[in-house]
From Swiss-Prot:
This is Protein AF-9 homolog. Component of the SWR1 chromatin-remodeling complex and of the NuA4 histone acetyltransferase complex. Residues 222-234 have a biased composition (Basic and acidic residues). The gene is yaf9. Residues 187-203 have a biased composition (Low complexity). GO terms for biological process: chromatin remodeling; DNA repair; regulation of transcription by RNA polymerase II. Keywords: Activator, Chromatin regulator, Coiled coil, Cytoplasm, DNA damage, DNA repair, Nucleus, Transcription, Transcription regulation. Residues 204-214 have a biased composition (Basic residues). One of its GO terms (cellular component) is nucleus. It holds the Pfam family YEATS. It comes from Neurospora crassa (strain ATCC 24698 / 74-OR23-1A / CBS 708.71 / DSM 1257 / FGSC 987). Residues 265-309 form a coiled coil. The coiled-coil domain is required for assembly into the NuA4 complex.
Amino acid sequence: MAPPTGKRVKGVQIFRPFVYGTTARPFDEKTNPKPPGIPDDHTHSWTVFIKGIDDVDITYWLRRVQFKLHESIPNHVRMVEGVKGQPFQIHETGWGEFEITMKLYYVPESSEKPQTLYHHLRLHPFGRTEEEKEAMRLNGGEVISWVYEEQIFNEPYEPFYDILISGALPPSASTLKDGGGGGGSGAATPTSANTPGASSSKGGNKKGHERSHSRASVSTNKDGKNNNESKEEPFVIQKSEGGVLERSAMIPLVNRPGQPFSRETEQLEIQKLKEAKLKVDEMKKQMMEELEKKQKRLEALRAESAKAP
């Protein structure tokens, strides 16, 4: 159902990066002991999650997530409500791999329909080559299966658009802001051209801009009423350790422990694609040369056959 205004911001797309996947660890007496009460046949502990890039908050656009696990697991359909600054996640134990269904429910202001993601739980080392599998084995047995994704909001409704562009906040300020949906007291409202991750149909600026904001300091009594009026205390936006601002489409510049997705990762993937293209071009060249030799040989045989009595 559309918001009261019922109007969409035409010609605008806003995207927000996030990460989803699973992390699994085999039970081990020293590094990962099995908790009491866990069935004997369970060999691993694992976590399935959806979170923001560089662990920034995403509850301003994602309200809740429904995780559908294997039917053999008790309470296999679970709803996780968003908690500001924390990932949507479930911790479990088991012995087998299976496909997990994740249904994303957006904040009411978006009026967007739920979307579904699918992810295969990985308990054992995997990869395209034996070297990749061996690298996982050397990682203390921890098996990481994460996916980088971008949520695109096409022509969002005006109330939701205002939330999305309500200003990027440094991660340290997330606990200072009230509520998980709006921009907070004193938040600036830049245009889409100045908002990371906002673009028009003609193309937009995806770079972040530092802006001065203010936060309200309010004390309350037991009844929840204000004991004094809001006091504005200005602060300057700063980048997080990974170079990411909250409520933005930024991603880290370099990789860090526990944060494998960055511009550095992107460049490495681009380099792999370039190397693969060179290899394919070389294979294509060799194939064409072999084909040309075979064609000449075929023409020679046809000529000999024509001369034969």
